[in-house]
């Protein structure tokens, strides 16, 4: 894919994106709990839970902790009553941010995000103030090396009414990836059908895909953005941050 990829900054929880192992585990456990609560607590019949477990295993979350998270989802523990909240904001250089969280206290999370953004000359926006710059889609990503035949992936994805199949290279690792995008309402079915055909994806999730990419050339602004992203990603409530920038 030529030019700057719209997937350049998609986060799928590699070690470099979360400073502490324990913090990564906290985020993975929250996703498992929420996924199990939204459907049957059995990954065979709950595709979102299956994806959450796959992600947890990739991060070496111990099986007993995965099982405990699923079990806790069937209880009524108040501290485990997480809800999915998306916050919108702007950062240095007027970059747009869609911050996906799992929180049990909206007010606390909003206050912490507002403080982090303001520290780097950004601001937390109202609903709709940033989202118009993005398209909300489902993404299923495969390492190119794990797919024997790209045409097969492409044809099956299109048959499933996927919006697109893109080939791109990760900026940091230079690893070639295939990204299947689909409408949000088709996400579960597309993910399940691709799983049946090609087994585990590298990751799959709902993604705020930027309509356009903002190129940041100023080194000082780049440093501020990097510091802000680190601060946001170190917040336990933050699961993903989708953005519309790339560094030049």
Swiss-Prot record:
One GO cellular component this record assigns the protein to is: cytoplasm
Q: Which UniProt keywords apply?
A: Cytoplasm, DNA-binding, Transcription, Transcription regulation
Please tell me whether the keyword Glycosyltransferase is annotated for this protein: no
Q: Which family does it belong to?
A: Belongs to the TACO1 family.
In Pfam terms, one family for this protein is Transcrip_reg
Q: Which GO terms describe its molecular function?
A: DNA binding
Q: Which domain of life is it from?
A: Bacteria
Q: Where is this region: Disordered?
A: 1-21
Cite the NCBIfam families for this sequence: PRK00110.1 (NF001030), PRK12378.1 (NF009044), YebC/PmpR family DNA-binding transcriptional regulator (TIGR01033)
Q: Which HAMAP family match?
A: Transcrip_reg_TACO1 (MF_00693)
Q: Which InterPro entries match?
A: Integrase-like_N (IPR017856), TACO1_YebC-like_2nd/3rd_dom (IPR048300), TACO1_YebC_N (IPR049083), Transcrip_reg_TACO1-like (IPR002876), Transcrip_reg_TACO1-like_dom3 (IPR026564), YebC-like (IPR029072)
Instruction: Kindly list the biological process annotations in GO that this record carries.
Output: regulation of DNA-templated transcription
Q: Which SUPFAM superfamilies match?
A: YebC-like
Location(s) in or outside the cell: Cytoplasm
Listed name of the protein: Probable transcriptional regulatory protein Ecaj_0351
Membrane-spanning intervals of the chain: none
Report the principal subcellular site. cytoplasm
């Amino acid at each position: 894919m030529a030019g700057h990829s719209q997937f350049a900054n998609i986060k799928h929880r590699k070690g470099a994106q979360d400073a502490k192992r324990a913090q990564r585990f906290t985020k993975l456990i929250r996703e498992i709990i929420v996924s199990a609560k939204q459907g049957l607590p059995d990954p065979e019949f709950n595709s979102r839970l299956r994806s959450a477990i796959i992600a947890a295993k990739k991060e070496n979350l111990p099986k007993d902790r995965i099982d405990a998270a699923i079990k806790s989802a069937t209880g009524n523990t108040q501290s485990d009553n997480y809800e999915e909240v998306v916050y919108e904001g702007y950062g240095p250089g007027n970059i747009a941010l869609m911050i996906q969280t799992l929180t049990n206290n909206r007010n606390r999370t909003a206050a912490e995000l507002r403080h982090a953004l303001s520290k780097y000359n950004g601001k937390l926006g109202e609903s709709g103030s940033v989202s118009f710059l993005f398209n909300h889609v489902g993404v299923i990503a495969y390492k190119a090396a794990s797919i024997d035949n790209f045409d097969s992936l492409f044809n099956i994805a299109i048959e499933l009414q996927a919006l697109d199949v893109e080939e791109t290279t990760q900026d940091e690792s230079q690893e070639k990836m295939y990204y299947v995008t689909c409408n949000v309402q088709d996400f579960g079915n597309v993910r399940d059908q691709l799983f049946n055909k090609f087994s585990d994806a590298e990751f799959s999730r709902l993604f705020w895909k930027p309509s356009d990419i903002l190129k940041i050339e100023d080194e000082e602004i780049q440093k501020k953005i990097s510091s802000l992203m680190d601060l946001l990603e170190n917040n336990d409530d933050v699961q993903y941050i989708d953005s519309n920038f790339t560094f030049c």
